[in-house]
Amino acid sequence: MAPRWDSLYPYYMSLDMHPDGDFSSCAVRLSMALHHADAFSKSGYRRAGNKVSSHGWAMGAEQLYRWLRLHQLGAAQQLPVDGTDPSQYPSQNGIVYLRDCFVRTSDRSTDARTGDHIDLFVAGQGLLSAIRWPVEFPGGPFAIIGTCRDGKVRFWPAS
């Protein structure tokens, strides 16, 4: 069942950029918002063998994406990869997962992106993290979507 936007969005907006002090802050933030919207169980996530933060929140965008797909939300829609045209993207709010969209410090080159990101998507505006913390997302709230090197951009609409 899709999480309610009116529960996800305000809670997410109240969070700090690094709410649990963990490196994988996008997964931590989203799992906190999903928990607030009754769409995430810390104990169920941990029992499934997923990596969790010191406070039991999801760590790692790809693990959270897989868990949501298998246990919570079902299959997600595939979105276009070009991050330059906002009209290509859904006209509704939801959750977006981006695979291999940024360079980690351990990557050997800028062409070898292995960093994933999971976030709330605001219809007509882009990634919520990029709207809230623009210095972390140069190029604007749609630009990072266009950097996904294998076209793995997935979307679940919120209710």
Residue ranges and their predicted role:
Residues 1-55:
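N-terminal capping segments
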Residues 26, 59-62, 156-159:
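Extracellular cell-wall/glycan-interacting regions and their flexible linkers
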Residues 48-131:
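...with weaker cross-activation on analogous glycine-rich loops/strands in unrelated enzymes
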Residues 115-159:
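Glycine-rich, aromatic-bearing surface loops/beta-hairpins
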